[in-house]
Every structure is written in structure tokens, then in C-alpha cells.
Amino acid sequence: CTGALIVLERMNNLDEIIRTGTPLSADVIPEMLGTIFYEGTPLHDGAVVIRDGRIVAAGCVLPLSNNLEMGKDMGTRHRAGLGMSENSDAIVVVVSEETGIISLAKNGVLIRRLDRQNLFNLLQEEIIPPETAEAQKQPLLNRLLNKGGAGKHAKTNAAR
């Protein structure tokens, strides 16, 4: 099993973390992540940082969590993921090297034992802000309401 530690930068700038690793400018594709996290490669023990949909660094060192409630079954990778989420608004995906179990750290909380679909859903919720998702729905709603002139009447009646 190959472990992974993937940091998704959000509002907090992570330049300080990025400087601890090797700078990259790469697409986020399975082949690239697989190469980075392949056991034995120089970058596989650190974290990948993703900014604006691009891998900007690999082999980065993250702050470790001091959370005493973490189970003994969680190693350095999980402590680093949790620590990063305690110190920033970043979202961190952790894949256990030993078990392959997927976890997600955000706001100092580690959500464990995610399958791919649950991870996808959580990331989609976190990465696409509600106002953006709502804005994406607006053109469809406008088309539906304006079909056959119903939208004009609905707007006029709503304004009264």
C-alpha cells in the first residue's frame, strides 16, 4: 500500500510550508501523485501541496498535532495531517501507508475510514463554496422560470 499526504490550500497562504519541500508545477493527476508517493522516491515521505488546482510542492514538512486524544494506531502522517488542519484552514487528505485507510483532516478534526465516494463528496462540499454552487444553479433556475413567460409573471408578482 502506498501512503499519501495531500494538502489543499484554501484561504490561508501556505508559502512557509511550501518552502520546506521541493517546488513543482504539475497537474493533479493520478500518475503524478502515484509517482510522488511511490515508496522509495525522495518525495514520498512528505506532503504534496495543491494550490489553485496545481501541485506546487512535494516532500513538504507539516506541523505535527499535539492532540493527546489521537489513537496509538495513528502515525506521523496522521499527526501531520491533523496538525496542518489545526494550524490553517487547509484540508488534508491522509492515506495510511500500512492500511490504505483514507482520512480527511479539517479544522482540527480527523474524519477516518472514508471510501472514495465519501472522500469525493466531502472534498466537493469543501472546495466548492455554497455561494458558488448556488451561482452555478442560477442559470438553470432562470431558464426554468423564464420558460413560456412564467418567469416574468413570477418576478412581477414577487415584486408586489
Where do the protein language model's features map onto the residues?
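Divalent-cation
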Residues: 1-160
